[in-house]
Amino acid sequence: MEKKYVLAIDQGTTSSRAMLFDRQGKVAGVAQREFGQIFPQPGWVEHNPREIMTSVYTTITELLNNAQIDAREISGIGITNQRETAVVWDKATGQPIYNAIVWQSRQTKDICTQLKEAGHEQMVRDKTGLLIDAYFSGTKVKWILDHVDGARERARKGELAFGTIDSWLIWNLTGGKVHVTDYTNASRTMMYNIHTLEWDAELLEMLDVPAQMLPEVRSSSEVYGMTQTQYFYGEQVPIAGIAGDQQAALFGQACFEPGIAKNTYGTGCFMLMNTGDKAVASKAGLLTTIAWGIDGKVEYALEGAIFVAGSVVQWLRDGLRMFGKASDSQAYAERAGDNDGVYFVPAFVGLGAPYWRSDIRGAVFGLTRGTSKEHFVRAAVESMAYQTRDVLTAMQSDSGIELKELRADGGAIANDFMAQFQSDILNVPVLRPEVAETTALGAAYLAGLATGFWSSREEIAKQWAVDRRFEPNMPEERREQLYAGWQQAVEATMGFRIS
């Protein structure tokens, strides 16, 4: 039977999606299922790994049924996932020994403090391109091994497996036959040396994580194994692509050349710039990470992670009940006319790149009796654009590359006001692609290249098309005045303490 589609599994922080893409890179079907969030203590975020798997199985079944697709028409499966989230499971039973500790969770912050006090920061930075932070997987694995009775000894005996979510999905989809990850996910663990391309003995010793529990690291585009027949109505489908969500979006946006960058506006905001075969060491608070590895060649990226972006709009809607739908924020922001001197620093969980301050909290400045709800909403929406400029300034400083355009994706960029304001504040064109689902598309492309569904990156690059291009049209004096106000607000926020 003719292969007509590639299936992408997009396993995110709050939901799992299965999406079909045709040869033109267009969406041919989608199914989505949310799953529960677990908050055992303030600042802790966990997921039930079995519930994640159930959500994935359900979306695959719904997608095939709704689209009336024969599994034999699927060329391969690409997997993209919430990065850094860590799972440890029993190899014999396949059962997790603890919940998945989510990337957002701060429950390992004390471990991070101890590692910093022991003087490990520079070594971690040099080997991994990362900072010592609770964000990354390594301290999460250590926490599980520290807190589950007998876990570390069982791991040393080879009885336990660790994986980021991609590894967990593949283990289950292949019936426990395949324990792998790819370069992109490995590079987010704080245990993987991005220069030697191997699990690093010194890092593992620092965290007291046994090497026996780690997955094999493979390229981002190859056939890793076949699914069990029960998931695809008696058929086996090759799993052929893996990338962490932000790297998948970089690939889906066809950012194949050094100096091309994308920004994903989701719960948080993640800007990545392709730096080619050069691992650029940041001096400005950014992360150095692996963009992807294909056909024996690894390419790198600079990354700036903003912790709160689209979630600020959700907070206005659900927490403050300022409007009914997230999309209403555009009308409120436009009605305001300007921000009336109001600045909103959404440091709900601290500030990410380039500041990396987890000890501060959100703040609002410039309120007067004349401040309206519209001004407040506008200031919140504008905060996404200001934070992006913070990251872009750092990125251009590190790379020595002046950005010519920014490719944007994610839910918040559907807001035309936000997209235009972003272009104005950056003084750079912002390009919104026709296919908004760039994360899933990137995973599909990686799988399709491995199975021959697509022939080359050149073929993929030709499919990338612009829905709308936003050109900067704000006078320079006004742009710099607004940004200077933001910088003052951030400085004041960082100086404020509640004892």
From Swiss-Prot:
Q: Look up the EC number in the record and give it.
A: 2.7.1.30
* Reaction catalysed by this enzyme: glycerol + ATP = sn-glycerol 3-phosphate + ADP + H(+)
Chain residues that bind ADP = T13, R17, T267, G310, G411, N415
Identify which top EC class this enzyme belongs to.
transferase
Give me the residues that bind glycerol, please.
R83, E84, Y135, D245, Q246
Signal peptide as annotated in the record: none
Looking up InterPro entries in the UniProt record yields: ATPase_NBD (IPR043129), Carb_kinase_FGGY (IPR000577), Carb_kinase_FGGY_CS (IPR018483), FGGY_C (IPR018485), FGGY_N (IPR018484), Glycerol_kin (IPR005999)
Q: Where sn-glycerol 3-phosphate is bound, by residue?
A: T13, R83, E84, Y135, D245
CDD domains the record matches: FGGY_EcGK_like (cd07786)
The Gene Ontology terms for molecular function here are: ATP binding; glycerol kinase activity
Name its GO BP terms in alphabetical order. glycerol catabolic process; glycerol metabolic process; glycerol-3-phosphate metabolic process
Query: Which Pfam family, just one, is annotated for this protein?
Result: FGGY_C
GO CC field: cytosol
Q: Does the keyword Nucleotide-binding apply?
A: yes
Pathway involvement of the protein, from the record: Polyol metabolism; glycerol degradation via glycerol kinase pathway; sn-glycerol 3-phosphate from glycerol: step 1/1
Keywords in UniProt for this one?
A: ATP-binding, Glycerol metabolism, Kinase, Nucleotide-binding, Transferase
- Residues annotated to bind ATP: T13, T14, S15, T267, G310, Q314, G411
For this protein, the activity regulation entry reads: Inhibited by fructose 1,6-bisphosphate (FBP).
The UniProt family comment states: Belongs to the FGGY kinase family.
What this chain does, per the entry, is described as: Key enzyme in the regulation of glycerol uptake and metabolism. Catalyzes the phosphorylation of glycerol to yield sn-glycerol 3-phosphate.
The name on file for this protein is: Glycerol kinase
